[in-house]
Design a protein with these regions (language model features):
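Cap/lid segment of the alpha/beta-hydrolase catalytic domain
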Residues: 79-101, 113-211
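Solvent-exposed loop/turn segments at secondary-structure junctions
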Residues: 25, 72-74, 125-129, 155-159, ...
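Acidic, Ser/Thr/Gly/Pro-rich low-complexity segments and short DxT(G/T)-type signature motifs
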Residues: 1-51, 56, 84-92, 125, ...
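Hydrolase active-site cap/lid region
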Residues: 161-168, 234-290
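Structural recognition of the beta-strand scaffold that forms the well-ordered cores
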Residues: 17-19, 66, 119-122, 148-153, ...
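N-terminal cap/lid segment of alpha/beta-hydrolase-fold proteins
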Residues: 47-116
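Gly/Ala-rich beta-loop-alpha elbow adjacent to hydrolase catalytic centers
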Residues: 220-233
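Short mixed-charge
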Residues: 2-4, 198-215, 271, 275-277, ...
Length: 290
């Protein structure tokens, strides 16, 4: 192989082969999830359940609505951290029995506006959760611009995934469990976006009404993601059929380059990855490969 490539062994330090990315390898599985899930919906609103409605939970929030929604399941182990795709003969994920239950939160802003609020999906940061949506800056944005923010978790890279992420850092051969669940998580964002714009979704629910009138404008939904939410938000926006505009704030770069340079990663680097892979070159190649 080296000879065919015109590489002289005398000047060679090391060599290895690897597979480069293709359109199919980058997008094929995620598009299979999206197309299969929305074909299953067949134009209907996704199923959801409201579990909590809290009036004025924080400054700037008129009402907080929390609940769960159903996402077609493509992972083993019920979709829990560590679950993986079941691949068909074509190499694409196959549907698994049951559904994945995803959490959501929506905050209605306390404003004087009588116009229905625009809708936005929020994407949280590194290994966080949907609660980041309710921070002071987002609340101010919602008040100033009459926006109802809704969020779910980036399953695969959410707070509940930290134990599995630590296991993977100790053995990078298990990285597929993160990548697979993360695509299930992106599917969750797609389904929540559909729930936000569908005429039989949130806009038809009394929890999203005041004095019998809907307080949201479901004609369009936007996306707002920060840090990890900006990195993963790019993939989400690329495959979303309902969201055409979004903000990707402080996105940084792909994880293979970012993590080794991030102070937020120091705890995992020093506590798990370095002991498992003492040589820096091994760590860099491993992170680049995944």
């Amino acid at each position: 192989d080296l000879g065919r490539a015109g590489v002289e062994r005398a000047a060679l330090h090391s060599a290895w082969d690897f597979t480069v990315a293709s359109t199919e390898s980058l997008t094929g599985r995620m598009l299979a999830l999206r197309d299969g899930a929305f074909a299953e919906l067949d134009g209907k609103a996704p199923a959801y359940r409201i579990t909590t409605v809290i009036e004025a939970p924080d400054d700037g929030i008129r009402r907080r609505i929390e609940g769960t929604f159903d996402v077609p399941l493509y992972l083993t182990d019920g979709g829990r951290p560590g679950g993986r795709f079941v691949l068909g003969d074509d190499g694409r994920p196959t549907r698994v029995d049951g559904t994945f239950t995803a959490a959501f939160r929506c905050d209605l802003p306390a404003t004087d506006s009588t116009a229905p609020a625009r809708l936005a999906l929020y994407g949280h940061g590194l290994l966080g959760d949907l609660g980041e949506m309710s921070g002071s800056l987002t609340r101010r944005m919602a008040q100033d611009h009459n926006i109802v923010y809704c969020a779910t978790n980036w399953y695969g890279m959410a707070e509940e995934d930290i134990p599995n992420a630590a296991r993977v850092l100790a053995d990078l051969s298990g990285f597929d469990s993160i990548a697979d669940r993360l695509q299930q998580g992106i599917l969750g964002f797609l389904v929540l976006g559909r729930l936000m714009v569908h005429d039989q979704g949130f806009v038809a629910d009394p929890a999203f009404a005041v004095d019998g009138r809907p307080v949201i404008d479901n004609s369009r939904v936007y996306y707002d993601g920060n840090s990890q939410g900006a990195i993963l938000g790019g993939a989400f926006l690329a495959v979303s059929q309902d969201v055409t505009r979004g903000v990707l704030a402080e996105a940084g770069m792909n994880y293979g380059l970012l993590l080794d340079r991030s102070v937020d990663f120091d705890e995992y680097l020093n506590g798990v990855l370095k002991p498992a892979y003492p040589a820096r070159i091994d760590r860099l190649i491993g992170m680049a490969a995944v």
